[in-house]
């Protein structure tokens, strides 16, 4: 006589349910999925006074997206998913905008964008009532995360506010509270300086003096004479913050200031999403794969593009669909998490579409620290101590 005990029945039931789930998953994965991703770049006018030494390679960003597609296809081949990448470079705004409409008519819905603020705003208007995913990988302006929010654009590049907060937290942690602020004369430098002023106020730092560099001196020949005089102040300072996006003068500040003090911001210690010195959490393997593919080191723009493609690919892996409306809903949901060689999962802020992430504090040849700094507390996640939190931002994309 065959007797089924309660324990055996539970065992058979679990196996049966597992088998049914396996059959369901096999059936769900029976149809292959393909997804085309468009990388679109608008060539920016060169900034006067920028040294060729600091110019990024022309393929910055695209190579990161290319590696992400390769990594995604490694997983995708087991799930019957395939990703492809197209590349388009525009030199004029009309050509840039027309390309999106053409791609949209051909059925493409995922776009990786390397373009300035004005064109991102235009694209967001174009994307209204369209099921498209737009990823900003290069524009760091705080305006897009605070006062001029874009409902169709996700930001994988950290904002100026996130970088300023990362540095300000480190200064607070090291008790370097007195700051000399030096800014360039360009509009982008003024905005960067304003971003740091916000961070200084937020974390209780004191800016003892502000100076603007608007000289045309060839610092390659005169830095040792010019900069000590320029950085002489009545009050003592612990650190010099440089706001110089194009690096026309900032790199000449270290070791030339009147007082022997560290330089942060646009030179010296910088806050970046990625740098070649990052090696933890599997980053070394990513760095090596990138060097093998691109024959150069991975920079922040490459990493931002990598994150954009991986955000899409992870969503496709999870949902097994290429329908853009479903991918958009998932990426913007609390369920979305992205593993990104940062030691923790990343996600997008629902109120501004900004990807929250730790930032590396680096100088050219070493990692110094990572922000958020120890002791920084937040009711939801300490990652939101970097940049505009929900209560600070005017964005209402999720409200």
Task: Report each predicted region and the residues it spans.
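Bacterial N-terminal signal peptides that target proteins for export
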Residues: 4-17
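N-terminal signal peptide c-region/cleavage motif recognized by signal peptidases
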Residues: 23-27
């Amino acid at each position: 006589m065959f007797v089924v005990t309660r324990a055996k029945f539970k065992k058979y039931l679990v196996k049966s349910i597992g088998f049914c789930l396996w059959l369901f998953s096999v059936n769900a994965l029976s149809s292959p999925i393909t997804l085309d991703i468009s990388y679109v770049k608008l060539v920016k006018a060169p900034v006067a006074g920028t040294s060729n030494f600091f110019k990024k390679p022309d393929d910055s960003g695209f190579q990161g997206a290319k590696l992400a597609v390769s990594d995604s296809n490694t997983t995708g081949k087991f799930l019957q998913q395939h990703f492809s990448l197209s590349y388009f470079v525009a030199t004029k705004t009309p050509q840039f905008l027309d390309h999106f409409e053409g791609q949209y008519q051909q059925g493409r819905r995922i776009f990786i964008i390397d373009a300035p603020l004005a064109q991102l705003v235009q694209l967001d208007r174009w994307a209204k009532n369209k099921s498209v995913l737009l990823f900003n990988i290069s524009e760091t302006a705080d305006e897009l995360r605070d006062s001029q929010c874009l409902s169709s654009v996700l930001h994988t590049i950290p904002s100026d506010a996130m970088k300023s907060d990362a540095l300000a937290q480190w200064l607070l942690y090291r008790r370097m509270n007195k700051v000399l602020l030096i800014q360039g004369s360009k509009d982008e430098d003024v905005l960067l300086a304003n971003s740091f002023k916000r961070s200084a106020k937020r974390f209780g730092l004191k800016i003892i003096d502000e100076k603007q560099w608007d000289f045309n001196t060839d610092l390659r020949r005169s830095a040792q004479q010019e900069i000590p005089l320029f950085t002489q102040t009545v009050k003592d300072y612990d650190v010099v913050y440089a706001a110089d996006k194009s690096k026309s003068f900032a790199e000449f500040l270290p070791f030339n200031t009147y007082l022997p003090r560290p330089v942060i911001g646009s030179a010296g210690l910088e806050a970046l999403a990625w740098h070649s010195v990052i090696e933890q959490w599997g980053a070394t393997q990513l760095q090596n794969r990138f060097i093998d593919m691109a024959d150069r080191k991975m920079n922040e723009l490459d990493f931002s593009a990598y994150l954009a493609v991986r955000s899409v690919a992870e969503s496709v892996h999870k949902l097994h669909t290429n329908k853009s409306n479903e991918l958009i809903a998932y990426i913007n949901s609390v369920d979305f998490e992205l593993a990104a060689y940062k030691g923790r999962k990343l996600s997008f802020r629902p109120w501004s579409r900004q990807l929250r992430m730790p930032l590396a504090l680096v100088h050219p040849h070493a990692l110094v620290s990572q922000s958020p700094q120890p002791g920084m507390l937040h009711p939801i996640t300490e990652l939101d101590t970097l940049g505009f939190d929900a209560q600070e931002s005017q964005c209402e994309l999720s409200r």
